[in-house]
Amino acid sequence: MEKGKFIYEGKAKQLYETDDKDLVIVHYKDDATAGNGAKKGTIHNKGIMNNEITALIFNMLEEHGIKTHFVKKLNDRDQLCQRVKIFPLEVIVRNIIAGSMAKRVGIKEGTKISNTIFEICYKNDEYGDPLINDHHAVAMGLATYDELKEIYDITGKINNLLKEKFDNIGITLVDFKIEFGKNSKGEILLADEITPDTCRLWDKKTGEKLDKDRFRRDLGNIEEAYIEVVKRLTEKK
């Protein structure tokens, strides 16, 4: 299937129409950003690696009954996906305290917690993707309570599957963010991507960061970290 009219460009991906109104082509770029776009750069072949990682993970989730927008990988950088209307929300799942939460509440990064923390942010670059709660989301018309409940239910299942998957390849899933959308049938689907761009992934033995924090924090060996994630996921499908 060939790319049609250009639809949209985000920080890490481009979207194109196809000859089917319900399908789009998602193109993965090498661009990298941090701090809501304040820091910009590129990671060599990041688009290729993130396309592969998302395809592997979304296929695994589909096999376990999670409905996603993913249809198939087309080539190194492109994948065919169902067209969805995205909820303007980021759903954040925290299994260990890290990143912005550590700073926000004054708890040391790496602190283990007895429960899983779910957060939502309003996806809006102008306002810095602010943290909101369910009542804000409903009042702002971003989602209904029923939609949020379904989203949280799906997210919990995704977290359990991802934790097990990464644990089996020697990686701790610290936290991650995901997005959801509705297709033409009105079904709520997991959308966007699940990659080292959107997850915090720490090596179980060494604690080494295998994610975009290497870019955010100028830790170096960024491409190597992404390659390692691809390698482990590919070796143990």
From Swiss-Prot:
Catalytic activity: 5-amino-1-(5-phospho-D-ribosyl)imidazole-4-carboxylate + L-aspartate + ATP = (2S)-2-[5-amino-1-(5-phospho-beta-D-ribosyl)imidazole-4-carboxamido]succinate + ADP + phosphate + 2 H(+)
GO terms for MF: ATP binding; phosphoribosylaminoimidazolesuccinocarboxamide synthase activity
Swiss-Prot/TrEMBL keywords: ATP-binding, Ligase, Nucleotide-binding, Purine biosynthesis
Involved pathway(s): Purine metabolism; IMP biosynthesis via de novo pathway; 5-amino-1-(5-phospho-D-ribosyl)imidazole-4-carboxamide from 5-amino-1-(5-phospho-D-ribosyl)imidazole-4-carboxylate: step 1/2
Top-level taxon in the UniProt lineage: Bacteria
One Pfam match: SAICAR_synt
GO BP: 'de novo' IMP biosynthetic process; cobalamin biosynthetic process
Enzyme Commission code(s) on record: 6.3.2.6
Entry keyword annotation includes ATP-binding: yes
PANTHER family named among the record's database cross-references: MULTIFUNCTIONAL PROTEIN ADE2, SI:DKEY-6E2.2
Family: Belongs to the SAICAR synthetase family.
Protein name: Phosphoribosylaminoimidazole-succinocarboxamide synthase
Native organism: Fusobacterium nucleatum subsp. nucleatum (strain ATCC 25586 / DSM 15643 / BCRC 10681 / CIP 101130 / JCM 8532 / KCTC 2640 / LMG 13131 / VPI 4355)
